[in-house]
Design a protein with these regions (language model features):
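Bacterial N-terminal signal peptides
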Residues: 8-17
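Extended terminal accessory/targeting regions
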Residues: 2-5, 20-166
Length: 166
């Protein structure tokens, strides 16, 4: 219960005054990280705002490095999952740095899927099913293997077939 309250407070503060949190102690890093890796639109917005203005967060020592979608395409069939992949990399790398990866992997993977579905919903309804299929395939790859490198061309071809059949 206490952990949930801390998480809610950290997320609320990150949305209202990101620079104020950044001036807090780095002992708050796990709470800030948790706030930025939830499968919600608000969490994504807070993380993305910090990603675009990293200066105030420098003292936390977050690892912002990314390989985008690893060896898989960032834009399969034109669906741009680049930022979703970067958000996923951010969660994986930083939870590994904190030694809390195993406890948070499933949520970071769920966040990745939620981010991709938010990309899909912006596409025309005629191709949305294909987008959701690719997103589900990418999600299953990270869920099972920890990387989207497991996505095969055949999976993308299946989604392309769905697009043509609509």
């Amino acid at each position: 219960m206490t952990r949930r309250i801390v998480l809610i407070l950290a997320l609320a503060l990150a949305l209202v005054a990101p620079a104020g949190i950044a001036r807090a102690t780095t002992a708050d890093k796990p709470a800030v990280l948790a706030g930025w890796t939830q499968p919600t639109k608000a969490s994504y917005a807070a993380w993305n705002a910090a990603r675009l203005d990293r200066g105030p967060w420098k003292e936390y020592g977050f690892d912002w490095s990314t390989d985008d979608c690893s060896a898989s395409p960032e834009r399969p069939l034109g669906f741009d999952f680049t930022i979703a992949c970067r958000h996923h990399d951010f969660g994986y790398r930083n939870y590994k740095d904190l030694g809390q990866f195993r406890a948070n992997k499933a949520r970071v993977d769920d966040t990745f899927y939620a981010d991709m579905k938010r990309v899909c919903v912006r596409h025309h309804i005629a191709v949305r099913a294909a987008c959701y299929t690719v997103a589900w395939t990418y999600y299953q790859a990270v869920y099972l293997f920890g990387s989207v490198t497991a996505v095969r061309q055949a999976d993308i071809n299946r989604a392309a077939t769905l697009m043509r059949d609509r």
